[in-house]
């Protein structure tokens, strides 16, 4: 499969709510997947499908959309920018549903081998997603300043003369 079509299929797999869809795009014998929510690498299309299933449980309308051109290197590595659009409608990782709609930008970096994704890393800002869900205080608010003070970062201090 050509790389652009492969990433289109990858995005459809994340958007389609069919955990078996990852088998068509991932190397069935030797896949390695990581993102900020995986505690350890996932090493089968079935494991990636189960991981996506947890996302679909909490965000029933989750969809991944292309946001720019895919970059393909001569060595089989490729990158695909995308955004996740979703509404938090059910419990996920212990977080009760907020009903909030989020947009999380990210990029998938992968090694393509024999027309399939082999080594895959999805990068996205987990803190931004949590902020959109209302978990931590929004940047620049008094809540954030109070939290930073409690964590020991405090306000800027004037240097001693």
Which role fits each region the language model picked out?
Residues 1-161:
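C-terminal and inter-domain tail/linker signature
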């Amino acid at each position: 499969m050509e790389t652009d079509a492969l990433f289109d299929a990858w995005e459809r797999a994340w958007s389609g709510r069919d955990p078996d869809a990852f088998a068509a795009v991932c190397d069935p014998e030797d896949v390695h997947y990581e993102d900020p929510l995986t505690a350890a690498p996932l090493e089968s299309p079935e494991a990636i499908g189960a991981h996506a299933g947890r996302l679909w449980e909490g965000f029933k309308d989750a969809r991944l959309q292309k946001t720019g051109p895919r970059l393909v290197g001569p060595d089989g590595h490729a990158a695909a920018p995308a955004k996740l659009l979703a509404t938090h409608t059910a419990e996920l990782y212990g977080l009760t549903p907020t009903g909030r709609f989020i947009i999380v930008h990210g990029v998938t970096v992968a090694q393509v081998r024999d027309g399939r994704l082999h080594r895959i890393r999805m990068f996205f800002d987990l803190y931004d997603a949590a902020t959109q869900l209302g978990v931590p205080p929004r940047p620049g608010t008094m809540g954030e300043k109070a939290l930073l003070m409690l964590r020991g970062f405090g306000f800027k201090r004037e240097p001693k003369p």
